[in-house]
Each structure stands twice: as structure tokens, then as C-alpha cells.
Amino acid sequence: MEEFKGYFELDRSRQHDFLYPLLFREYIYALAHDHGLNRSILFKNAGYDKKSSSIVVKRLITRMYQQNPLIFSANDSIQNPFFGHNKNLYSQIISEGFAVIVEIPFSFSLRLVSSLERKEIAKSHNLRSIHSIFPFLEDKFSHLDYVSDVLIPYHIHLEILVQTLRYWVKDASSLHLLRFFLHEYWNSLITPKKHITLFSKGNPRLFLFLYNSHICEYESTFLFLRNQSSHLRSTSSGIFFERIYFYVKIEHFAKVFFDNDFQCILWFFKDPFMHYVRYQGKSILGSKDTPLLMNKWKYYLVTLWQYHFYAWFQPGRIDINQLCKYSLDFLGYRSSVPLNSSVVRSQMLENSFLINNAMKKFETIVPIIPLIGSLSKANFCNTLGHPISKPTRADSSDSDIIDRFLRICRNLSHYHSGSSKKKSLYRVKYILRLSCVKTLARKHKRTVRTFFKRLGSEFLEEFLTEEEVVLSLIFPRTYSTSRRLYRGQIWYLDITSINDLVNYENDWLLDHGNVNYL
């Protein structure tokens, strides 16, 4: 948000009161399109006239208040690339402007809270790694006994979203326009999914922001967990306000909740071993205490959602399981904490006896069946996991085809580097490698055997994963050591988005080269 500092020269006393006029500033939409963030002059960017202008925005807002439908013909979409960019340009433009504007109060409040607390709030890039959540689970959950898998309600009333922003945005005109906009275009902007958290990648940034603010409202009710819990979050959104403002809203929410009937209930939740983790539309509560405490948590969450957020929350959406007998499926991994028995023979004088030690170990494996299902939908194999040739364009070169397969293979290997067992990952690499050969053979109308002879062993070495290459460079003389390290769990802190192949509930979009932003 530091980029906004040079563009918004507003009086600090009026920052919250005059956000509505910013909708008619052209640099707002330049920022929304990622133009000119690092330049002193915004309007010298090539192709900016194809994006947006204040005149277009004024017409859109006027027509929206008049409730006149804005219809573009096919010819307009062809003549103007900007109008053909989205199926619903009307809602897209307004939402992009809103997305930038509603973040302004958050940026100023962040600096204010930092100065009041006299400490620096953690930067968002230190919290963005998805893999950072697994060391936390490995360290904490191996000592817990029970886990509760909570499915966050996705039927959010639009008025609740607007009221959430009232704590930050004091401009009545902006709130009225936002309320009208949400009621008119909610169905056209939200992808119909099972959960509201599963936004498609083409959806506006505004709704990701609204969802994060809604989750912030929900998570700030965990006042009593602030000193006991760790909050390493992973989210598919590029905006990370929910952790930054977790502590800001605690004081306000404490007054609301401790003045009602929940005050007597909170005394039952004194558990120093309670931990909370959220990922996408689900959250996990882990505890070392008895199932009675977990059932009290269940009752508390159901009451919270029904009476505070006015969302119907069925108790069946919260599953309570014994951790040693339950597997958690999230972020492309299947995690469990099984009991591993270790038998030790002890000798004392002439007597010997066996000691059976039960130890808990956090394990993560790659669920091969969903992963093969995603490869099948992407036409890399059939439903049984047999590699097939993938249709390609006639003008695609052999090097482009090989590079694309290598990129997908390395991204998957990089993402699943924390797997305890690599057997499933080896099978995926085999599918991609053979599918690549069959694709090349289909293009040149030759047999697979012929292409294997033509490519030789160098082609197989190209599918060597990045982790193996790095470890072989670190330990060049001890190959067995590097192989042993590779077979272990390796967590990377540069993965900030879920790979589409392992995000089994989303669409299967594979044309992304960098695992950091797929």
C-alpha cells in the first residue's frame, strides 16, 4: 500500500469522509490495472486509453442509479478491446475502482496502529507462504489429541458485508453505492461454487477483499485465543488484511461479546493447548483436552454464526475426531498424526523385558487419486492413470511442448516437496513424462519407441526435479546424502499460491509457469 502514498494527497482528517469522489479519478483505475505503480507519471503508459476513464465511470454510475441495463453488442466487443475484456464490463469497472478505494482506510489505519503500539506489524510477505503452515502443524498438532474440522458458512448476507466495512469507511455515499452495487451484481460477479471462498481467478479483487474483511470479523471473536494460538494463514487472495487487523478489532469485539450471554460460556474455554488454523473455506481447531471441551466449542461456533452473523450454521458442519485416527485433507496434502510404536528390549541383570513406546509423528502424503483425477481432466492421462497424448497446436515447437511439461512437473515437485512418501509423486512424474513423449509422437506421427530412442537418456534427466539438482550441487561428493535429504520433507517459503493441479475444488487451469503465482 506504500505505492498509494504519492497519489493520494488528502487531508488526514478527511480521509474517511471523502472516498466517493475518488471513483471519478482516472489514476484509481490505472492502479487497479497495475499501471504506473512504480512510475511518477501514470498517464504515459501505452494502451492506457483502452482501460478506463472518468467519463466512462460517470456514465456507468449514472446508469446504475437509473437501473438501465447496459448491453454491449458483439461488434462493440470486437471494435473496443476494453469492452470485450469481460462479459460484464459494467460490474467489472466499478468493482475495480471500489477495490482500490476501500483499501485506503486500511492502509492509514495500519500505520496508526503501528505507531500506537510502538512496534512494527509483520510484513505480509512473511506470512504469505503456504508451506509455512505445515511446520506449525508439525510442531503443535503432534501433541494434541482431538481435532475439529470446521466448514465456514458461505451464505453471507450482503448487508453483513457492508456493515463490516462501516468500522473503517465513514463515507455514507460510498457505502450506499457499495450496497446498491452488491445487490444488483452479486450473482454476476460471484462464481457459483460450493463455498464462497472459491473465487475464480477472473473475479474482481473487491470480493476477495470483502471476504477477507468478513473472515477478519469472524476470527476477531477469538479474543481468548490470542495469547495461546498461532495464526499462520494461507489464502488464495493477494490481499492479507485479516492478520494485520486481527488485533485492531479485538477491543471492539470484546465489548460486544462480553456484554451478552457469551460471557458465562467463555470461562469454559480455558485451554492452553487450543490451536487454530484456517485455510480457504475451512478452519481447524486442535485441542489436547477432552471431547467435552470440543463439543462446547462446537456449540459456541454454531451460536456465533447464527446469532451474530445471521447465517444458518448446521452442527453437522463441524466434525470432531480423534487426531491419531483422522486425516486432514487440505492444500493438496493429506496430513495425519499416527501412533508409531517402537519396541525396545531392556536388560536388567538376568531379566529382560520389552518396552513398547508409542510416538506421534506428523506425516504428510500426496493423495494420488485426486491428483490423477486432475491430470485426467487436463488430458494428461485417463481416469485409470494411464498416460495419453495431449492435443497441441500445429505451430507449437518441440521445445515449447517439452518446456511446458517440464514446468508442470517441476512445479508439482516443488509444491509437494514436503511429502513424507514420494512414491505418489514419482508416479505423477512418470505420467507427465510419458504423456510428453506421446504428445510429441502424435505431432510427428511416429511411434513412442522411436521418440524414446531419438530423445535418449538426456530427456529423462530433464525431468530431474529442481530439489534433486540443488541438493546434488550442495553435496556433490555424497550422492547418497543428497538422495536421503530429498526423500525427506522439505518446506519452501516462496510458495504463495495453491497449484491448480492440487487445488481439487477449483478449475484446472495449467497455463502458469511460476509456482509462486499459479
Curated annotation (Swiss-Prot):
GO biological-process terms attached to the record: mRNA processing; RNA splicing; tRNA processing
Keyword match Membrane: no
UniProt GO molecular function: RNA binding
Source species, domain of life: Eukaryota
GO cellular component: chloroplast
UniProt subcellular location: Plastid, Chloroplast
Swiss-Prot/TrEMBL keywords: Chloroplast, mRNA processing, Plastid, RNA-binding, tRNA processing
PANTHER family to which the protein is assigned, alphabetical: MATURASE K
Family, per entry: Belongs to the intron maturase 2 family. MatK subfamily.
Function field: Usually encoded in the trnK tRNA gene intron. Probably assists in splicing its own and other chloroplast group II introns.
UniProt protein name: Maturase K
Source organism (scientific name): Syzygium cumini
Highest classification ranks of the organism: Eukaryota, Viridiplantae, Streptophyta, Embryophyta, Tracheophyta
